[in-house]
Amino acid sequence: MFMLPLGLMAQTVKGKVTDSSGEGLPFMNVIVKGTSNGTTTDDKGEFSITVKKLPVNLVISSIGFKTRVINVSNSSYLTITIQDGNESLEEIVVIGSRNPNRTAIDSPVPIDIVDVKELTAMAPQVNLNQILNFVAPSFTSNTQTISDGTDHIDPASLRGLGPDQVLVLINGKRRHTSSLINVNGTFGRGSVGTDLNSIPSSAIKRLEVLRDGAAAQYGSDAIAGVINIVLNESVNELSLVVTSGAHFSKNSNSQTGGVDGETTNISASYGLPIGENGGFINFSGDFDVREDYNRMKEWEGGIFNGYNAVERFANAANYDTTQFLSLANGLDPASTDYNTILNDLKGFANAAGYNTTASDGLSELQTILNVDATTSELAARGLERTDFNMRVGQSKVRGSRLFANFKLPLDNNGTEIYSFAGLSSRAGNSAGFYRLPSQSRTFTPAYINGFLPEINSTISDQSLAVGIKGKIGDWNVDFSNAYGKNAFDYMIGNTYNASQGVASPTVFDAGGFSFTQNTTNLDLNRFFENTFEGLGVAFGAEHRLENYQIISGEEASYTQYQADGTPFTGIAGTSPLKDFYGRSRPGGSQVFPGFGPQNELDRSRSSVAAYVDLDATFSETFSTTLATRYENYSDFGSTLNFKLASIYKASDNFRIRASFNTGFRAPSLHQLNFNSTSTIFEDGVPVEVGTFANDSKAAKLLGIPQLKEETSNSFSAGFTAKLPESNISITLDGYMVNIDDRVVYTGQFKGPGTGSELDRLLVQANASAASFFANAIDTQSKGVDLVITHKANLGENARLKSDLAATFSKTEQVGGIKASDVLEAAGLVDTYFPETSRIFLEESVPRTKVNLTNSLTTGKFNIFLRNVYFGEVSEATNTVANQQTFATKIVTDLSLGYKAAENLTLTVGANNLLDVFPDRAIEANRSGGRFDWSRRSQQFGVGGRFLFARVSFNLK
């Protein structure tokens, strides 16, 4: 029904934008007036744009230059001269309004436009999370360490809110989230984010960051804002970029200095025109290799005990030390074998320097040998304390990504088929806590000196969106379907199931999980030019289907065994395998116990939504947007939200804007259904924690309320201003976001140890404590965002662009903890929402962040200088006395680019040029030397100085 008679064939318009001296101007915006069809000039000032028909009006604009409107009536090559001026950036944006003529500066809500091509040409960062972290102050994301799967997918935040309160779009279509839910000790604990690093930066034309609630326009998750990724549309242009670098830091290589964390990224992009009507397909992709780095200096705690010394002497005599362990695992004390082994043990203990002459039995030997023997054993074994270090820092990564963006116009009236698709695969490798030989979780006959277990991840991501849009009468119609899937699989290496004894493998398939989302949209919009001063009307419907799965691993990855090799069930009279001291050996693969059949699940849900969006311009000075959206979920019910936003043009150079909206976020399928057992370290002490579903029997026993949606209301107000005499533009926006029934990950509930039903459930889960997802608190977030932009010519060949962006924010708990009567009566309210969880929400990311970026282009050279001010963060711990505050820091990036040839640019530079580190942790938070810098509250990471070199080819 979208097919209309063909008109004139589309045309490609090419040209060059120059300043008054004839010098080409890069990064100028070239837009077909009244549409969102646009491009930017390259580093020579040249552009190419496909238009549906001629004649057409092109709008040429950029900060610091006067905007020009050029009427193009033929396809001859254009040379367009732009005069210096005071016009601000008027980039037409996709998000925040469905008015096709709305620009960022005329938007009633704050929108940041991030030119990814410009940044990746000069800035050190190449992945999307880090690009945004250093360019958008309201956005925060850092690599994590010793946090299981979160080492491999970086959590991200907008305005200090959770990773699951930011909606991500690609070309205006909803992007699926990750399959990983963060349950370890990091910011974003208990939430599910979007894996932005699965999208290659070479595939991105620009980013649009909407810093305002938008659930009434886009649905669930848009409480903090929206990030829209606009894909690359370039054709007949091959872009190839190779970036390589490493950390050259005083704290590299376990704080001895040197080079580590080597990284190489190779990206490419090429587009082909299709047909004669402006169609195209663009392919973009990259491949990267990232090595790990380690910032742990030296383990300072105990390593060996007296029994380990006995083992060393026994091993030297080729004695089977597993016989010693049989003494604590059911061997009959009256048997001949028992007494023989006991006497052998005494003999080796005496040889090791322990006097066992007066000891009569095993318990006395256990007491005698239960002493620290670290110093003597290190010397005897020729080892150093550094041999027992962990890998505290970034994980290893090998990854590749491929994206395609396609459009095929079918006529000259806007009918077109479009599609975009992505594939990515990443293999990650990180390590956990070192398993020391003195611990019960180390089976020393297999690992005499302990071991460093590794988490190997395989993360795959696929997406495909297909749509058709055109006109029915005077209405623009867009029908689309977007599919996405993310899967995360665990392979645990260099590890052991200590409860399995000699039968344990050292590599385990621990299972994994996947998340799939399919979204179908029908959108209609029309612009009424003669209603008021213009009225945009949009309405539409959406259907979304989601599926979440947990896949079990092999039996040994999740099972705790008895001494006879059968699974331990917790039945009275049975016990798991014990170590020499009689301590139970934990089951499952060390560092990450696998998912078992009891965890396995396949859950789906659907939602339907309908929306209406009105954008009215009442006069040349005042316009208003009103949006409302109804949404119904199959698993928790319906919600109705609205948004009202207005902008008033007080003068040509000053605008005032404000908005109010309500919002919601449905609990994710992950939060509703995730269940597993994992090893969580609390103050350096390992605890097997079972995560139980919110509707589980354990949740009911403890009085954990059923999960429901988060609801929000938010208000923002601000202004945009231009200072014509100084070529400066300013935006300032204040905001307040109130969220009720915020979903958190609780603390650890321990069983009473009386054989209760909760105790039995914990044993069945191979856990000693239980955690849940719950609507525990209300929060309020408030702050101010400031953006100042200046662009100027310095002489004939030099241009300086400066951007100052800052955010000042605060998130805090409002009111009391929403605990049930059962929790109140049991005195477990502080476990339900502990201090650690409060700090993760309020103080674990910088509340203040300021970014000052300067880019100077002169002749063949480009100089990039950026300083980022990171505000204070606090250590997330339940011990109030140890809640250390880490002071503010400034990180400096610097690069120098040189255009060596027409199609070749060379760039060298540094991230964190001055090798700045966060404050060191106080002694109580160092965990015996494991963490000299906080692993729970990251300001900007602990990599230190990163030096890079880049070669960029651009062939047309």
Residue ranges and their predicted role:
Residues 18-23, 28-33, 57-65, 73-121:
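Short, acidic, small-residue-rich periplasmic hinge/interaction motif at the N-terminus
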Residues 447, 451-466, 470-471, 483, ...:
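Outer-membrane beta-barrel transmembrane domain signature of Gram-negative proteins
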Residues 539, 734-877:
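Gram-negative outer-membrane beta-barrel transporters
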Residues 48-50, 129-179:
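Extracytoplasmic beta-strand/coil segments of soluble accessory domains associated
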Residues 76-83, 128-131, 156, 194-197, ...:
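N-terminal periplasmic accessory domains that precede
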Residues 178, 739, 810-813, 868-876, ...:
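C-terminal beta-signal and adjacent terminal beta-strands/loops
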Residues 47-50, 173-211:
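Short acidic/polar hinge/loop motifs at secondary-structure boundaries
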Residues 232-249, 254, 365, 371-379, ...:
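Surface-exposed extracellular loop regions of Gram-negative outer-membrane beta-barrel proteins
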